[in-house]
Amino acid sequence: MRSRPTDHARRAIGFGWLVLATVALIVPGAGARQARHYALESVEGLRLHNVTAQPATLQGKKGLRVTISDEAFRRLQGMTPAEQAQVQQLALIEGVDFTNGVIQAEIAGVPAPGAPEGARGFVGIAFRLQSDLKTYDAFYLRPTNGRADDQERRNHAAQYISHPDWPWSRLRQETPSRYEAYVDLVPDVWTKIKIDVRADHARLYVHDQEQPTLVVNDVKTGAQGRGAVALWLDRGTVAHFRNLTVEPSTAK
């Protein structure tokens, strides 16, 4: 005859199940890695490339104000438009190796004083950035397009690019509307964005929306692409960034 467990044994078994349940709650899901948060209230931890950055307050929230550097601006003056397009303005987040995962931030952009007529306040996030600081994927916004009277401009409010081979101009010419989308935007106003990357699929979410603003099913760096994360802006933009979170994942 099998003996019945004592009260002490039953309590021990119950405690064991409690421990297992607690561990299940606190251990991250398969493939998850530690999320890294950057307040972006200083330039600490950033590598500046053709930009200047300084702490600033916008709409009562602290962040970084980022613009093209004076030196880079002077160099652009002697270049052709094609050459200018190859000059990138980036603030690299040091120590990040990103393949798949989620990137979130609050960003704002407005055309800089004296910017060309075509300036839109371009501002965004680059990912899988290579050491040459020229090869990367990115999602960015055109804030002045968000409420433009021209519907075509509205349709170009959000953009995916992959430099150097797939700039916005080539993507728009060869596959109109596939890598651009409408989203309501206001210049120089904090805008929450989330970029979710899985292999060669990426989605851009704006304003905490449950559904993506822009879906890309053929990320140009491919399923195995990897590299750094950087704050991204166009040379004619006054950009602000704050509250950046990078959460890499091994899941595909």
Question: PLM features: what roles do these ranges have?
Answer:
Residues 33-252:
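Extracellular glycan-recognition regions
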Residues 14-26:
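Bacterial N-terminal signal peptides
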Residues 29-31:
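Sec/Tat signal peptide C-region and signal peptidase I cleavage site
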Residues 1-11:
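N-terminal secretory signal peptides that target proteins for export/translocation
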Residues 12-13, 175:
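N-terminal compositionally biased or targeting/leader segments
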Residues 8-10, 20-22, 130, 233:
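Residues at secondary-structure transition points
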